[in-house]
Structure formats: C-alpha cells, structure tokens
Amino acid sequence: MMQQEQTFTIINKLGLHARAAAKFVTTAAEFQSDILVRRDGREVNGKSIMGVMMLAAAKGTEITVRADGNDADAALSAIGRLIDDYFGEGQ
C-alpha cells in the first residue's frame, strides 16, 4: 500500500463551493485509495461532499491531500489537475 501527500492552493475565484466540492468528490471517488483532505488542522474524507464543503476553502487557501492505496499517485495527480483547471470553471 502506498501513501502520498501533497499540498495544493485553491486558485478558483469561488473556492471549494458546492459545485467545485462535488467535482472534487467525484474525482476522488474514481480511485480505490482513501483520500483525506486537511486544512488548518481539520481533516475530512475527500470522498464526502459534506466533509469537503465543511473545509470552507476559499480562494488562496492551502489544503493538504493524502491518498492511501495502490493508486495514490494517480489520485493525487487527478486531483491536482482538477484544482489547476479551476475545477473547470475557467477562473
């Protein structure tokens, strides 16, 4: 089993609001690895929309994503691409 961790900065204008959180959870759910997201000492399940929304990660917020499992690398890469793409919102 592999464990990977990476810190990302939320760059889209609206932060991790409902639609972005839904895309995050949908992406995380594509992988078998457990996905945990941490912000300011609070850690939530990255496959739980309520958990991800509770982080209230606004633009400029740093989140740390940890993936535990055989596809941990791929999971973090996919989540990183989603964040870098502004969650598909264009800004």
Where are the regions that the model predicts?
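Generic detection of intrinsically disordered/low-complexity segments and helix-coil linkers/edges
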Residues: 2, 18, 25, 80-81
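C-terminal structural segments of small proteins and small subunits
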Residues: 58-91
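Intrinsic-disorder/low-complexity, polar/charged segments enriched in Ser/Thr/Lys/Arg/Asp/Glu/Gln
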Residues: 3-7, 62-64
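Compact, glycine-rich, soluble single-domain proteins
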Residues: 9-50, 54-59
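SAM-dependent methyltransferases
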Residues: 1-2, 91
